[in-house]
Amino acid sequence: MPETVRGCTKLFEVQVHHAPDKACAKTLSKAVVTSSLTKAAIYGKDANWGRILCAMGYSGAAFNPLKVDISLQSKKGSLTIVKDGVATDYSEEKATEILAEDAVTAVIDIHNGEVTATAWGCDLTHEYISINADYRS
């Protein structure tokens, strides 16, 4: 997908696992994948888990932040950055390596059911903003 979206450099996938129902899982995954702050962090290769939890929080879906686990994945591996709502002692270098790939997945486990949902989007780049800010119809 990055090649098909002008100004996009990465496919960004968000998986939400163990939600109580499909609506909750979809709402959370869509909130994270569409968050401008999260998309900008993905572009900047920044494992900013606070932006992910923030997007989840304003989604309106019910979840317990103290039960949330967040991992980042790509062809370069997997890294757990949040466990039970608390940042892990993860390697920034490894996180940057994972986030440098052209396809990145955030795996979020809310430990509150058996339902999973996945949403797809892209990063938010300077070029994307320029293309769309300068476009005139």
Name every feature range the model reports, one short phrase each.
Residues 1-27, 33:
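N-terminal glycine-/lysine-enriched basic segments
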Residues 18, 26-30, 34-137:
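Internal helix-turn-beta structural module
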